[in-house]
């Protein structure tokens, strides 16, 4: 299991998929809760604040891409505003069926299929720039240049014939 105290990024990276019991949503998101949160689930229009560790299922030089804990910069967005990939939105809000909404304090591992990730970015790499409104989460290019380049080469490369699934370990915060 992903340990829940101390350094989230280190403990999330140490957890193996074999430790978790995954389920699959009707849209293809695989998910497992390492810790179920408490309180009210967020609603569309509300602000989500998360820490995440981003990894990939297919990379030659290691799987980890980026962690918000590295720079102590949680990712924030307004749910439903189109600024975030569909797979992450569904994982936070739930799908009304088997994928239950996350609750504050919860920690969930996600395997997001390419169809709910960054597929459109690969089709037109010019939309990649954060300044152009590409959906997040994306490693910040100025503060985490190497991680941004790794992300760009894996998910936003029109020359790449296959785009691997995205793995996110997500910790959802309450009001911050």
Segments from the language model and where they lie:
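Start-of-domain signal
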Residues: 1-51, 159, 174
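Short beta-strand-to-coil "C-cap" segments at the C-terminal boundary of structured domains/repeats
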Residues: 170-176
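Residues in well-ordered beta-strands of folded domains
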Residues: 32, 78, 171
């Amino acid at each position: 299991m992903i340990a829940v105290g101390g350094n989230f990024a280190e403990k999330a990276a140490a957890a193996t998929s074999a430790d978790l019991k995954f389920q699959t949503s009707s849209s293809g998101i695989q998910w497992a809760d390492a810790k179920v949160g408490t309180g009210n689930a967020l609603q569309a229009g509300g602000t989500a604040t998360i820490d995440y560790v981003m990894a990939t299922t297919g990379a030659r030089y290691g799987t980890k891409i980026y962690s918000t804990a590295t720079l102590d910069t949680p990712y924030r967005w307004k749910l439903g505003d189109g600024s975030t990939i569909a797979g992450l939105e569904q994982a936070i809000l739930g799908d009304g069926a088997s994928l239950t909404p996350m609750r504050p304090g919860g920690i969930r591992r996600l395997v997001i299929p390419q169809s709910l990730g960054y597929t459109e970015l690969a089709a037109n790499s010019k939309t990649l720039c954060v300044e152009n409104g590409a959906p997040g989460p994306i490693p910040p290019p100025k503060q985490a240049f190497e991680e941004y380049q790794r992300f760009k080469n894996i998910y936003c490369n029109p020359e790449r014939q296959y785009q691997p699934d995205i793995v996110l370990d997500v910790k959802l915060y309450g009001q911050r």
